[in-house]
């Protein structure tokens, strides 16, 4: 008899025994004497059986009890031979589930659930301890205060930014009709895009506005600038391809053009509100709007926005206010403040990412029936810093690839130079969005982004040397959540407080 890899289970043995077992005399007699098969019963018995439900129920119970007793007897008899002491218990070479060779092939769903339970328990205790020690720190003016009314110039500036897309549309319409030459079109677009970016900067610098209002305006103006550049660059490329087709230098089928060159105000208006930074005359659309799903996302957005406000007011503000400048004073105390700030800062950043990239952009896409909703990838699994920047913000990444990185390569620049230019542009915009609302130009954000370039080289080297290694992922999480962002928060906060102290 061949020995199988696993001992035969009791259930399998029971099934096999039931197939081999012959019917007993009792069961045979019961089968032929049952009321359903008996044909020579007297009419009185039939009348008696049909007239008495209690008698029928008692007979059925007796039959069921007899069958159960037979099954139990059979089970006990099979158990004697199902797993004998002589059956081999060890049949082949096996590794422990947590050994280095098999740990990544095992499912760790239970440990993941344990981490979730521990995380909830620990954070619940910290919240209760914080409330018992400091009380409720959230002020009534957190969401809105009378000081917000002084930011009306920023609000008017935000509304006036729609003028620049309209000006770009007029330029493109004139270029389509060949009323102005191509060099003039390029110069006009440079003027329009530059003005759309520096006009809000001047408004913020001239007004003593709140930090949140300034950041909101700068982010909005940067989005408008990126959209205008994409609009101008895409139409420029489509005009060039159309000229090649008209001259007969290229065939339309070989140019990979999914749509004809057409300047439409409707397509521009849709592009301005769509959750994308890359212009094209048409986009993939969904058939309808899911109203129930949309309502659930709105509820989630409100809840997580409240969670962010709670963490900022209850945790981050007290930690920052009781800290010192990280580059001055006691190094050990500064390190403790950075580490203490890292956890709530990470929670806020994750909530912000979830609220904006998942909830808000999906809500906007659902309202506009925008089909391509790959706004991010699994950046949390990034093994290198380069992978993180390529996956965490897909709208910006697609814009960089389409309008900056590949154009640099087409002009003969090496990949390293194109990558450096991409990080340089990103660093400039990070500095604008933070330094301008703070009225501080210390280049902390610029330096933090440019510091990613050597990290890209280091993590790429480690990934090539240690295949399938998570060393790069650990370095990314440490730099991102433990060192980088908390350090920037403390640097800008103390520089901002020093500036306000000098003004007072």
UniProtKB/Swiss-Prot annotation:
Chief localisation class: endoplasmic reticulum
Species classification: Eukaryota, Viridiplantae, Streptophyta, Embryophyta, Tracheophyta
Highest taxon in the source lineage: Eukaryota
The gene coding this protein: DGAT1B
Pathway: Glycerolipid metabolism; triacylglycerol biosynthesis
Localization in the cell: Endoplasmic reticulum membrane
Assigned protein family: Belongs to the membrane-bound acyltransferase family. Sterol o-acyltransferase subfamily.
Residue spans of biased composition, Low complexity class: 53-65
PANTHER family to which the protein is assigned, alphabetical: DIACYLGLYCEROL O-ACYLTRANSFERASE 1A (PTHR10408:SF22), STEROL O-ACYLTRANSFERASE (PTHR10408)
The protein, known as: Diacylglycerol O-acyltransferase 1B
Lipid metabolism as UniProt keyword: yes
Species this protein is from: Glycine max (Soybean)
Span of the annotated motif FYXDWWN motif: 375-381
């Amino acid at each position: 008899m061949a020995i199988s890899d696993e001992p035969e289970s009791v259930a399998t043995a029971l099934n096999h025994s039931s197939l081999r077992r012959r019917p007993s005399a009792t069961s045979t007699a019961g089968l032929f004497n049952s009321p359903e098969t008996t044909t020579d019963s007297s009419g009185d018995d039939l009348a008696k059986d049909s007239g008495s439900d209690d008698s029928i129920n008692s007979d059925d119970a007796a039959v069921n009890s007899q069958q159960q007793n037979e099954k139990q007897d059979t089970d006990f008899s099979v158990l004697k031979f199902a797993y004998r002491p002589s059956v081999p218990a060890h049949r082949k070479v096996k590794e422990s589930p947590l050994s280095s060779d098999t740990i990544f092939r095992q499912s760790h769903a239970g440990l993941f659930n344990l981490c979730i339970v521990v995380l909830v328990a620990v954070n619940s205790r910290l919240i209760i301890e914080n409330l018992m020690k400091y009380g409720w720190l959230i002020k009534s003016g957190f969401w809105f205060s009378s000081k917000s009314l002084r930011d009306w110039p920023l609000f008017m500036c935000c509304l006036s930014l729609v003028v620049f897309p309209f000006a770009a549309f007029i330029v493109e319409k004139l270029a389509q009709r060949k009323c102005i030459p191509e060099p003039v079109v390029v110069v006009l677009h440079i003027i329009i895009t530059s003005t759309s970016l520096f006009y809000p900067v001047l408004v913020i610098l001239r007004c003593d506005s709140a930090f949140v209002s300034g950041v909101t305006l700068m982010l909005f103006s940067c989005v408008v600038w990126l959209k205008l550049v994409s609009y101008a660059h895409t139409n420029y490329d489509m005009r060039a391809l159309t000229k090649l087709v008209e001259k007969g230098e290229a065939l339309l089928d070989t140019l990979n053009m999914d749509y004809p060159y057409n300047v439409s105000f409707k397509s521009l208006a849709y592009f301005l509100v769509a959750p994308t930074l890359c212009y094209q005359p048409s986009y993939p659309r969904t058939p309808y709007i899911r109203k129930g799903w949309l309502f659930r996302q709105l509820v989630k957005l409100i809840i997580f926005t409240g969670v962010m406000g709670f963490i900022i007011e209850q945790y981050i503000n007290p930690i920052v206010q009781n800290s010192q400048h990280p580059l001055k004073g006691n190094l050990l105390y500064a390190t403790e403040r950075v580490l203490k700030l890292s956890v709530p800062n990470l929670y806020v950043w994750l909530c912000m990412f979830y609220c904006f990239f998942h909830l808000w952009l999906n809500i906007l896409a659902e309202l506009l029936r925008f089909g391509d909703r790959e706004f991010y990838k699994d950046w949390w699994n990034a093994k290198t810093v380069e992978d993180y920047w390529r996956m965490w913000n897909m709208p910006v990444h697609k814009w960089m690839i389409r309008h900056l990185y590949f154009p640099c390569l087409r002009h003969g620049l090496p990949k390293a130079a194109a990558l450096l230019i991409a990080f340089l542009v990103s660093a400039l915009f990070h500095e604008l969005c933070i330094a301008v609302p703070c009225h501080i130009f210390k280049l902390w954000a610029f330096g933090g982004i440019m510091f990613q370039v050597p990290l890209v080289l280091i993590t790429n080297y480690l990934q090539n040397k240690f295949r399938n290694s998570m060393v790069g992922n650990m370095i990314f999480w440490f730099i991102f959540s433990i060192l980088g962002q908390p350090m920037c928060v403390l640097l800008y906060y103390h520089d901002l407080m020093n500036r306000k102290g000098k003004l007072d």
